[in-house]
């Protein structure tokens, strides 16, 4: 496997791969390098017919805080072409993980905001620590969760989507489980034990049958197509170019409240 700088891949003797986000000092927030490395890693993993499953994990206190601050600043000042290029890279990364032929199991601790929820939405099974917290906070910045939207909406359904997309409020692991974002909530200190239980089930299933079952499920449940993703990219670019985004992002970096907050 290729050695990366922002992520790490390990494979155990049972051919279970671990894909680990490795920017703990930045709460594993996305920048363009991490997005590109995750896309490349997904291609490598997809091409290995010996793998039985992939565990998506993260170093440090947080699973993924969403967009990296410097990356977000660059988006705010980029032209429309640049904004769309970055959004398209993020969408293609999520699609590559979503389409992995083997099961993708997310091990989630700490916070998962914005794009971190996108990673959860493209996973087949999500196991979260009871203390984990989740939010789509984009509207607080004057933005919308457009690029991750096609994947998250399919996971949450209409009611969950409307609530989480509009308000940006923080939800507990139990609430995320009720909405279908999380499959299992592990008791404090028991996250790895819960993951082990799930991996035991993976080891008991026929590898080829699991791949066929996943492919069949994806084909029947309806996945984002190219037009849907392209629409999301344009909507995000529109959002980035709006006055609210300019004010919200400026307030965020100035550590002040945006003009609409009360």
Functional labels for PLM-detected ranges:
Residues 19, 56, 68, 119-121, ...:
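Hydrophobic/aromatic residues within transmembrane alpha-helices
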Residues 1-59, 95, 192:
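Conserved CoA-thioester-binding segment of acyl-CoA-metabolizing enzymes
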Residues 58-95, 112, 224:
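Glycine- (often His-adjacent) and acidic-residue-rich active-site loop
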Residues 35, 66-69, 87-90, 149, ...:
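A general structural signal for well-ordered alpha-helical segments in protein cores
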